């Protein structure tokens, strides 16, 4: 679209449109894996891959999932997710039992489309783009030549009832949605199927709990005005946690120096076009390599560029 739309919302009625039995009752003692930060790494719990896949999504701080096992630096949950131990804590309790989900509102707010929900317990979920033609390659199973998704699925764990969706008249990113009941590895779950208003036009999502304890999904509204963009540039390698420089590959020059030079050039050209650019100062500050995309999220970036050579 050409410009950010005004803030408008459609509100839910609270009418219950689906029910499921609780997977774990309130009289059952359990151990939870509880996330201790937003934008934590989430991995596929059915394999040992060290790369977090795009078909899992991001979960907010406070999310609860049932503990299944652990190995090395990971906790594995019964829903098939795997978390770094540094991103989560183990806590004892009883099963969630009845855990209703109420859809409060859908609309646009502050340059994002949003969906606001109320949950009794902060159960986990999975956000998955549907309609992409992935293929396997050197970097794994999720290589793409083009982003062609038509729908976004949000599959909720341990939810026992859901309410009717408001209309999508005031939602720019999605044109429609519906609740489905699906069987995931023998467990019945609710899935929210969201139809993209423009196929292939999707910039990901964030999920956090707001000040009133509501689950808030945000989906950035993309515009044709490059001046609305924030781009974070990450020159590869640089200062390590021990204070010395990581040069990267070494040939006639050091890779880190080449990366920094290219990053500064890209930064200057983008700024000349009116883009808000943030360059990570990897030449003077330490940024954990695995978490650099998450540092970028703190700037509300629309595009993250990691430069290597």
Which residue stretches match the model-derived regions?
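Histidine- and/or cysteine-centered catalytic micro-motif in compact active-site loops
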Residues: 282, 308-309
